[in-house]
């Protein structure tokens, strides 16, 4: 797994990956990857370009099937071979491109592919109520109308709609791919507040990010991937920015180990 720079929380992880391998022809994308994602915690997944973050995320989301290893969901071994398998467990993903249709309104986007029917017709009133409730629960208050097209929304509003769409389906784990990419200061704050609210609702949250300011702003835990291997994971308080950069670029760091020891945590390899 790499270096464990702290003691694990007492709660059982909602999701665990153990010894996960994934290759594409001769290219080994993931090697013996372990990962723990806990309910009510935000785990920041960090790594340089090509480190394996997106491949790992897509394996958890059911886009790619792992070659070796095992996933566990709430302590039980599971197989995630398709996005439908992931959705059944309660795993939802918000990709960097958001997968929103600009020409459709907010309600239509939130129910795209999962429309509710009544007597063979779209149950518009029910979908509007559900969309409004989800946005209200997440305290998304900046949209003018749930019937405005996504094309008319700001970047932060679009991200909020994509997140609301992900949590609407009884999700228990939400994965966010670079949720603040290309956003301004105000919009970034809005999205990070939204990420915190997901945690406060008891969801397990995994946030892929290159922005270490965002990582240390919201993350409870940090996991770092280097060349397809998980080289470190633990409490965010056991890292500093330089140690994360060291792990991302070289796969090792002495700084986090010193900090972990100062915190009374354990370190080692397993």
For the regions a protein language model found, what residue spans apply to each?
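Glycine-rich phosphate-binding loops of nucleotide-dependent enzymes
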Residues: 2-270
């Amino acid at each position: 797994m790499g270096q464990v720079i702290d003691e694990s929380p007492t709660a059982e992880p909602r999701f665990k990956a153990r010894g996960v391998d994934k290759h594409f022809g001769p290219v080994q994308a993931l090697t013996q990857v372990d990962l723990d994602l806990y309910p009510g915690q935000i785990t920041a997944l960090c790594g340089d370009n090509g480190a394996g973050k997106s491949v790992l995320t897509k394996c958890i989301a059911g886009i790619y099937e792992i070659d070796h290893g095992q996933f566990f969901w709430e302590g039980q071994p599971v197989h995630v071979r398709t996005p439908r398998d992931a959705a059944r467990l309660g795993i939802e993903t918000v990709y960097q491109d958001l997968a929103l249709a600009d020409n459709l309104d907010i309600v239509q986007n939130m129910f795209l592919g999962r429309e509710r029917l009544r007597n063979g017709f779209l149950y518009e009133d029910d979908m509007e109520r559900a969309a409004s409730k989800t946005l209200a629960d997440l305290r998304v208050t900046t949209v003018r109308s749930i019937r405005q097209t996504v094309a008319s929304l700001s970047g932060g509003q679009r991200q909020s709609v994509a997140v609301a769409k992900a949590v609407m389906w009884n999700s228990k784990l939400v994965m966010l791919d670079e949720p603040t990419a290309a956003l301004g200061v105000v919009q970034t704050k809005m999205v990070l507040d939204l990420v915190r609210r997901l945690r406060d609702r008891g969801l397990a949250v995994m946030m892929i990010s290159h922005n270490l300011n965002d990582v240390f702003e919201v993350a409870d835990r940090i996991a770092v991937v280097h060349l397809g291997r998980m080289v470190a994971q633990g409490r965010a308080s056991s890292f500093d920015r330089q140690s994360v950069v060291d792990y991302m670029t070289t796969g090792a760091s002495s700084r986090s180990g010193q900090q972990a020891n100062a915190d009374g945590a354990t370190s080692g390899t397993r």
